[in-house]
Regions:
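A short SAM/SAH-binding and catalytic strip from SAM-dependent methyltransferases
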Residues: 99-111
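A short glycine-rich, Lys/Arg-flanked "PGG" loop and its adjoining helix->strand segment in the class I
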Residues: 114-126
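Class I SAM-dependent methyltransferase SAM/SAH-binding core
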Residues: 36-38, 42-90
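Conserved class I S-adenosyl-L-methionine
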Residues: 1-30, 44-48, 65-68, 131-153, 192-194
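A short acidic, Gly/Pro-enriched loop at the edge of an enzyme's catalytic core
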Residues: 89-100
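Short alpha-helix
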Residues: 160-174
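Conserved Class I S-adenosyl-L-methionine
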Residues: 42, 113, 177-245
């Protein structure tokens, strides 16, 4: 992700969205003062929460992403952020450290999403919330397979777009009672999508062929256009730690 960091800093779908608006609104509602943004990427979510929280810790595994996030924070003159390099499945913080843990458009890269959810739950204070936004797969097995096939072809680091019910299961297993915000459609510009992650030319050809030969239900579900633009689905899963925990 290092070479792609600048492209993610400029990405419209990472900079804004209905899912981010919903996360920010809930953050204000619960008056979260100390926030951890996991797999922060270029920092858009962390910076947005820094506008309304006392302190935000932005965490990512990729140094270039952290550098981009720090540069954006400096541009906006935000001084209540700090940046740390660490893995979502091994958070370097004590138990009960944060009012809110967020992760946006990143969890499809998690090698062990269940472990990441458990770690997020561990560092939440009583009454705290985990808010995880990501692209979600359909409960239809054929649509699920098609989605994850083209995601991997575009980006070999893709692990899986999970179904909403799978995320809810991860939350329950970590002791979090899940609720779902959304889902919302996310319109994708094909050319920008492959350029952002520097998809190899041969894989771009493969993606176009995959879309050209997609079954009618897949073309309809993903809104695939003649120019290859298409539509994904995003949802936010929210889980809370009981104040009595």
């Amino acid at each position: 992700f290092g070479p792609a960091a600048a492209a993610y800093a400029a990405s419209p779908v990472h900079r804004a969205g209905a899912d981010l608006d919903a996360m920010l609104a809930l953050g204000r509602e619960v008056a979260a003062r100390r926030v951890l943004d996991v797999a922060c990427g270029a920092g858009h979510t962390a910076l947005a929460f820094a506008e309304q929280a006392d302190e935000v810790v932005a965490l990512d595994l990729t140094p270039a992403m952290l550098e981009q996030a720090a540069a954006l924070a400096a541009e906006r003159r935000l001084t209540n952020l700090r940046f740390e390099r660490a893995d979502a499945a091994a958070l370097p913080f004590p138990d009960a450290s944060f009012d809110l843990v967020t992760s946006r458009l990143a969890a499809h890269h998690y090698a062990d999403p269940a472990a990441a959810v458990r770690e997020a739950a561990r560092v939440l204070r009583p009454g705290g919330r985990l808010m995880l936004s990501d692209i979600v797969a359909s409960d239809d097995p054929a649509l699920d397979t098609f989605l994850n096939a083209f995601e991997v072809l575009r980006d070999a680091s893709h692990a899986r777009d999970h179904r909403i019910r799978q995320w809810c299961g991860f939350f329950r297993d970590a002791g979090l009672a899940p609720e779902v915000l959304g889902p919302w459609p996310m319109q994708i510009d094909f050319d920008a999508w492959v350029e952002r992650i520097r998809t190899p030319p041969a894989s771009v050809v493969g993606l176009r062929a995959l879309f050209d030969h997609a079954p009618a239900p897949s073309r309809e579900a993903f809104g695939i256009s003649d120019g290859y633009d298409f539509r994904l689905t995003v949802a936010v899963i929210v889980g809370g730690i009981s104040a009595g925990s």
